[in-house]
Amino acid sequence: MTKLPYALLEKGSLLIASPDVNGGVFSRSVILVCEHSPNGSFGLILNKTLEMDSPEEVFPLDHFDESRVRFCMGGPLQANQIMLLHSSSSEDANSSIEICPSVFLGGDFSFIQEGEIKSNDEKMLFCFGYSGWQAGQLEKEFLEGLWFLAPASQEIVFTARPDKLWSDVLQNLGGRFASMSTVPENLLLN
């Protein structure tokens, strides 16, 4: 995996929080950029898993294998809004937007509720809330060294272990980033 320069920040990139981002929701976050333009940016945190006692309260998912469905905190903004990342290219999901190869955002939730996902390989990530930046804000944070950039993939979004995602992505970038992947969360423990 190669670290991307800031000029390549676009939909489908990953933002990886620097170890300097300590405390708060963005500490050790890996964010999938879903939109980036001169007007601002938004993305979804991939590695802040939410444990839910009764996910059926959100959607009737009794026809899905639990290993294919995950819930996470997408970010601090509008936490009551649910955004769906999925791997279904089904015609029933045609109102979805492809973020990176085989990773789609949104769509009509009815294709899920009606069990229209046809492949056993298709996965879903329900994100509560999102992360957003006003025009110029993300650029400023990037120049301050608060974020690193890497390419996203379906494997990273749906298959990687959320609790190891931050360190794994940094490790895969190599060099000084691999060294950063071993920095303890609490520097007093170092």
Curated annotation (Swiss-Prot):
Pfam families per the UniProt record, alphabetical: DUF179
Domain of life: Bacteria
Database matches in SUPFAM superfamilies: VC0467-like
Gene Ontology CC, one term: cytosol
InterPro entries per the UniProt record, alphabetical: AlgH-like (IPR003774)
Coiled-coil ranges (or none): none
HAMAP family linked to this entry: UPF0301
Family the UniProt entry places it in: Belongs to the UPF0301 (AlgH) family.
PANTHER family: UNCHARACTERIZED PROTEIN YQGE, UPF0301 PROTEIN YQGE
Name of the protein in its database record: UPF0301 protein TC_0483
Organism placement in taxonomy: Bacteria, Pseudomonadati, Chlamydiota, Chlamydiia, Chlamydiales
